[in-house]
């Protein structure tokens, strides 16, 4: 299934997903808050779904424009922003590979927290990154999320381990190419090998500031951690943010977040 119809039917679950996966959200937000210029600068959340990050950043005082391929995601984002009593500058229905309606050098920060999951070809991924770079101001910060090559294998090991022998050809395809194009409950996707990320982003003109595994050491077994509150929860966020920066653990996370600066 293509990304647009998938998310049109999945918007409430996508909003809830980051409640079930609190570590991913908390670690990603930690990196965003560390490297994004202070509010009230301007931010484009391109492919931001129902607005989890956009609404949180708006709450912090950023001027946030949310763009997404799914109209249902945008509708839910407007609803959630109203409930949170925050304002988004705009909500735009568009594809992250073509931001022709947005002016160049317009934003202090750009988030690509989903589009690169669903662009199967290298050329499309480069196009999305270059479009994000175009609308980013000089020395602006780009935050790009990826799903790792090994995430679907962890998922199947927990839920349906027989999948590996029932679909050996497809499993080999995932390992070798990272391309998910089969009719399953998830949209078509590209699962990146961790070694690809920095070369890809730097080839587009970015200076690397940080690469972090968003789940640290708790990918697919974070239920008990997610129940924590207060100091115990913050201690695990601190630990996972620290360990997520260890290159030997990049593949242990389901998601990677790249942080780069536009040079030149």
Map each language-model feature to its residues.
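A short glycine-rich, Lys/Arg-flanked "PGG" loop and its adjoining helix->strand segment in the class I
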Residues: 126-138
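Short alpha-helix
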Residues: 188-205, 211
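A short acidic, Gly/Pro-enriched loop at the edge of an enzyme's catalytic core
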Residues: 100-110
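A short SAM/SAH-binding and catalytic strip from SAM-dependent methyltransferases
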Residues: 108-123
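Conserved class I S-adenosyl-L-methionine
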Residues: 1-39, 52, 56, 141-173
